[in-house]
Amino acid sequence: YGELLNRQNKILGNMLGAEIDFLIKGIDNKSRSVAASRKDAMLKKRQIFYLPDANGTSRVCEGRIVQARVIAVAEKTVRTEIFGVEYSIPARDLSYDWMGDATENYHVGDQILVRITSVSISSVTDISVKADVKSVLGNTSVENLQKCKVQGKYIGTITDIHKGTVFIRLNIGVNAIAHSCYDSRLPGKKDEVSFVVTRIDSERNVAVGLISRIVKQNI
């Protein structure tokens, strides 16, 4: 029970500042307080937006762009509420641009546009939904990649490091990959680096090259 309570407190802590709906279940005039249910409000919203109307159509369906509320944010995910259904959007679905930390771009209480990619309905209490943000924002990487020249030197920020491969977001709006670093210091996440392009990978829309030096370490 203690573990469950800790988990619930953690979830509530992460949701501080979130905008939520609730149905009032009771009022105590003496203590000037109300008892309310978020769960009931979410079920009501699900009935309105997900279940088919008299014409057999649903307001929230695959392919539709809708507004979602941001209710929690972590480094690699943004938790949203989409008309009574919660869904955590992974960083890879937030933007075509490589993102090191979602908390720098998204905040609890934000309202964002998402595209519904799938809806699964078994009953009003059992609805799951998937959505992304990047298809709404569009992809500028292809256009920006044309600004890159082989042997060109650009400044960027390290978004991630995985198995020796360094992922960089260049300031000119291009995703880049480096397999080697010529600075004596080890590169780290969020470091600002100078990147030299050795080739352009048009298929994957990335610049490939090396880190010539670390301009500013994220300490």
Name every feature range the model reports, one short phrase each.
Residues Y1-I219:
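Single-stranded RNA-binding regions, centering on S1/OB-family and related RNA-binding modules
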